[in-house]
Design a protein with these regions (language model features):
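Iron-sulfur-associated redox domains of electron-transfer enzymes in respiratory
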Residues: 1-262
Length: 262
């Protein structure tokens, strides 16, 4: 999401406001320390331009606010800037384990069946169990899904898949326990129930949202109509997708070299 947003800002948004992409400084506030590394990946460049310039974690932002004596919790609420200022409940639940899966299922159901989803909540993917699996019925078309969070659970799930013990059509994996709400850049907290509380807050935001399906966001609809042409278009793929390469050999080689020095 970080890189997709930044890519759109430095193309579509830049065009809208009449500013050169290289003159925009894009700063993202994230719960994830890995996002700092993500922005350095060469595969994330768009037309040779780095789309996200800086990443500040939520904990770092909190420290900045305290350093400047900004009463963060007392700041008045205000709307996000437009274009791209509208959000949905589906976007909010991305922050908790199972949220990406649930958001995708809300849209997938309606795209596949052509009908409104009678119940938006997919309880099968909610909760903090390390691995959750379910079979979802899209009006006769059944898909097997799995959700895993925390690398020990992820490793176990992937091993089962490789060994042929399990098969899924769609898998959501999050490295941090609890999902983004448990990210390495989040404020440190000694409350044992903090993840449950953060999770409940996110689902509450979703429930109170006027728009709860990703594909209903008017800004996204407008973005595709005016700029990206259609979902999965060449332009959308160029700006919103990336690719990865197998680095295992290089990592093993570096590890051996490190051990030989010791």
């Amino acid at each position: 999401p970080q890189q997709m947003m930044s890519s759109v800002v430095k193309t579509y948004f830049a065009e809208k406001i009449g500013v050169k992409p290289e003159d925009i400084v894009m700063v993202s506030v994230m719960p994830c320390t890995a996002k700092k590394d993500e922005i350095t990946r060469p595969q994330q460049l768009v037309d040779g331009i780095k789309v996200t310039d800086y990443v500040v974690t939520t904990r770092e932002l909190g420290k900045m606010a305290r350093f400047k004596n900004i009463p963060f919790v007392n700041l008045p609420e205000e709307d996000y800037d437009n274009p791209l200022g509208t959000s949905t409940g589906a976007a909010a639940i991305f922050g908790v384990t199972g949220g990406v899966m649930e958001a995708a299922l809300r849209t997938a159901y309606e795209v596949v069946t052509g009908e409104k989803l009678p119940k938006l909540e997919f309880d099968q993917v909610r909760g903090l169990e390390g691995v959750r699996e379910a079979e979802i019925d899209l009006k006769g078309k059944k898909i097997k899904i799995a959700v895993a969070h925390g690398m020990a659970n992820v490793k176990r799930l992937l091993s089962d898949i490789k060994e042929g013990k399990r098969y899924y059509d769609f898998i959501e994996i999050m490295a941090c326990y609890g999902g983004c709400i448990g990210g390495g850049g989040q404020p440190k907290n000694l409350d044992a129930d903090i993840l449950k509380k953060r999770s409940a807050a996110i689902y509450s935001i979703d429930e109170m949202s006027v728009l709860r399906r990703s594909h209903e966001n008017p800004d996204i609809i407008k973005l595709y109509n005016e700029f990206l042409e259609k979902p999965n278009s060449h332009k959308a793929h160029h700006l919103l997708h990336t690719h990865y390469t197998d680095r295992s050999k290089a990592v093993r080689k570096a590890k051996k070299a490190e051990e030989s020095v010791k």
